[in-house]
Amino acid sequence: MTIGIIGAMEEEVELLKNSMPSVEEIVIGGAKFYVGEIAGKEVVLLESGIGKVNAALGTTLMADRFKPEVIINTGSAGGMAEGLAVGDVIISDRLAYGDVDVTEFGYTYGQVPRMPAFYQGDAVLLKKAETIYREYFAASENKAVYGLVVTNDSFIMRPDQHETIRTFFPDVKAVEMEAAAIAQVAYQFDIPFLIIRAISDLANQEATISFDEFIHLAARQSATCIIELLKTI
């Protein structure tokens, strides 16, 4: 089994890359692929670049060239739900776009025409993650949360951005910039997927300072969770 893992930034894939005993690097169209093993599993690790287009391009290349049987997305996110703290982990059971509006044609806000309104994480992978992280976080000050993640091509920090997202997605748990695009490509290629992100900021007016300070913590938390998950796949 080949497992695809995708992170947008170097910081988000560094720990995973360093976990590979040997690595083959392949660059296609600016997307950086690292081929090796993690926890005894054959892995293709992608540093896609930031944003939906980069994520979709990289995921498509991964699906076409490397034929992964599972795709997992790692990285950071901005917390939107009450009670979330930096270092908490969000496991997404649903994903949506927060900046797509074709409602004039009868689509749900966030829905790309002829695509689902929400992309569902793989039920088997979600169950594995739930079991693992219940034990992993039992003695931790951080926690794992399950729910809706919303993807935007903007870094969310302003009150007006918050208001728009909460208006259309009142149960949103976190926001970020790639996951729904990855999920859409996985959906179109019929590849099971799971999104695991760690909170780097609280998507407020201090978010840029928090992100710069805590991106490495969030990346480490997310990557560590994925390594634990790989042991069970």
UniProtKB/Swiss-Prot annotation:
UniProt keyword annotation of Hydrolase present: yes
GO BP: L-methionine salvage from methylthioadenosine; L-methionine salvage from S-adenosylmethionine; nucleoside catabolic process
One Pfam family it belongs to: PNP_UDP_1
The keyword NAD belongs to this UniProt entry's keyword annotation: no
EC number: 3.2.2.9
Active site feature: 12 (proton acceptor), 201 (proton donor)
One of the record's GO cellular component terms: cytosol
Its biological purpose: Catalyzes the irreversible cleavage of the glycosidic bond in both 5'-methylthioadenosine (MTA) and S-adenosylhomocysteine (SAH/AdoHcy) to adenine and the corresponding thioribose, 5'-methylthioribose and S-ribosylhomocysteine, respectively. Also cleaves 5'-deoxyadenosine, a toxic by-product of radical S-adenosylmethionine (SAM) enzymes, into 5-deoxyribose and adenine.
Protein name: 5'-methylthioadenosine/S-adenosylhomocysteine nucleosidase
Provenance organism: Listeria monocytogenes serotype 4b (strain F2365)
